[in-house]
Amino acid sequence: FGGLLYFAKDFKNLTKNEVQNKISNYQSLAKIPMLMAVDEEGGTVSRISSNKNLVADPFLSPSELYQKGGLEAIKEDTIKKTNILSELGLNLNLAPVVDITLNKEDYMYERSLQEDAQITSEYAQTVIRTSDPTKLSFTLKHFPGYGNNADTHQGISIDTRDLNTIKQQDLKPFIAG
């Protein structure tokens, strides 16, 4: 059992047919169907929708979608992502980001919904309930929640918050989803 994680460079300048063939060729080599993953969050993390050959307009960030049309816009976006990614042969989206962060200075702010635990929980539920798991699975990120911590791509981050704070805020969207 295994899989591949694709990044924007893996789709650069490719057409829909080229991506489908590439993924299909990898799958044909596996004895067991592989996970074919991408993190298409929208906004600053847009691996697929950064390629105009694959998606006409890049996917918006969660906060942009929510501000534009609330949970209905989230539903429409989830359906669109599910259809586009699954048509390409991908079966796992490492999204949505359900970290709770309300401070513009926080590392995860631009990638998050930028709302409280209750609304972020509703967001997580909406994505999971709207998705079609026979086409595409989603992963809620970043368990147990980044909070206001530093970028772990740049080094080690230590969360000094107490467990009760994490339970009351950060874990709620993961439980809801």
In which residue ranges do the predicted regions lie?
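Short, contiguous, pocket-lining structural segments
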Residues: 112, 119, 123, 166-169
